[in-house]
Regions:
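Active-site metal-binding motif and surrounding structural segment of the metallo-beta-lactamase
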Residues: 68-116
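Active-site neighborhood of phospho(di)ester-bond hydrolases with catalytic His/Asp-centered motifs
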Residues: 59-62, 86-94, 116-118, 165-168, ...
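Active-site glycine- and acidic-residue-rich loops that bind
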Residues: 162-175
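Conserved beta-strand hairpin/beta-sheet module of binuclear metal-dependent hydrolase folds
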Residues: 9-77, 175-188
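Metallo-beta-lactamase
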Residues: 109-165, 211-218, 224-227
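Short, well-ordered secondary-structure micro-motifs
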Residues: 22, 101, 126-129, 161, ...
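Cap/insert and terminal regions of metallo-dependent hydrolase folds
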Residues: 179-242
Length: 242
């Protein structure tokens, strides 16, 4: 844990993975091998824990859940139990970011937490045209019911935490949160080893590839002008760096 103004932060690794060449359409295999040095890209599914000076506990994203995710076990090992979490901020609503919100019977894992999602994201998943992934999203929205809150970009979601537009990865707006001393970014960076030197590299998960490329370039410029470290949902452990 490190000091973070009126909060401290902790990365919780929900799952560890390695990304294959086939996940990067359009990238020359020779360049992929050169940049990776071994044919696979280390990746991670991360959750970030923030604790404010007033004792309120905030999670940013919730990992995979189920057998694929280790978030709950690791949180409990550090003394943080689901019922003690006050707020959950979602970068977006893909399965590896919301799966941990649901128990095996579709119940809400976090019994008290308010869940914050951007208004464009909420509207996208509500319209019933989002395909199979929409089923899981609607289960989450149903399980948390009146505890779901929406926000718009540029707003202060919670005191000291602002939501910034990082449109591109999805057709809605995958985004980032800025705290007093940290930038928390969603899926603009799946594979740091490739996408930092080559922001034009996309994965099969980028629903809007051209938008994702533009968003990455904008984010790199923004991050380069900021003294704050970057925390990434898919950056390799420890998930925070410059």
């Amino acid at each position: 844990s490190r000091g973070l103004g009126d909060v401290y932060k902790r990365q919780v690794q929900d799952a560890l993975s390695a990304m294959r060449f086939e996940l990067f359409p359009g990238m020359p295999e020779e360049e992929f091998l050169r940049l990776t040095g071994g044919g696979r890209v280390p990746s991670s599914v991360n959750v970030f824990l923030l604790k404010r000076g007033d004792g309120k506990i905030i999670l940013v994203d919730a990992g995979n859940g189920g057998k694929r995710g280790g978030m709950l076990r690791k949180l409990e090992q550090s003394g943080v139990f689901p019922e003690s979490v006050d707020f959950i901020l979602l970068t977006h609503m893909h399965g590896d970011h919301i799966g941990g919100l649901l128990g095996k019977h579709g119940e809400a894992v976090f019994s008290r937490a308010l869940v914050y999602v951007s208004m464009p994201e909420w509207e996208f998943w509500q319209n019933g045209t989002a395909g199979p992934q929409g089923k899981q999203v609607r289960k989450v929205l149903h399980a948390y019911g009146s505890r779901v809150r929406t926000f718009r970009f540029g707003e202060e979601v919670l005191p000291g935490i602002k939501a910034l537009d990082a449109s591109g990865h999805t057709y809605t707006r995958a985004y980032l949160f800025e705290t007093d001393s940290l930038l928390i970014v969603g899926d603009l960076l799946h594979a740091a080893a490739l996408q930092i030197p080559r922001p034009e590299v996309c994965t099969i998960y980028d629903m809007n590839p051209s938008g994702a490329v533009q968003a990455r370039r904008r984010f790199y410029e923004f991050a380069a002008s900021s003294p704050k470290p970057v925390a990434g949902m898919h950056l390799p452990y420890p998930g925070i760096g410059r």
